[in-house]
Amino acid sequence: MPGPLEEKSKKFAVRIVRLFQHLADEKKEHVLSRQILRSGTSIGANISEARGAQSQSDFISKFSIAYKEAFETDYWIDLLEETGYIQAKLGKSLKADLNELISILTTSLKTSKANRQTTSRL
């Protein structure tokens, strides 16, 4: 059963897909919109994939990828906003959701790495 982080990341991915569809419908930017589609949906995909991790290292790896994809997505949001392809209000809203995901991922990664250290000492 998906947890709260998976649900939040899926809702964020849906927002990104809708943004991509809007940009495509408006015949606006294509390269940047594909980049944000890829990185923005990859966050949730890696979080979901971590649920089936075969080891703690595998789990940490998937969450680390999701974390990096979140920062890449942040970059694309900035670029789309600064080039006028999306309004500042939308950019701010997307970033608020993204920052929440980053915060949860940061905490989860710190905890998982600390647990791995503790386990390896036993």
Predicted features along the sequence, with ranges:
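Short, C-terminally biased terminal segments at protein or domain edges
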Residues: M1-E49, A53-L122
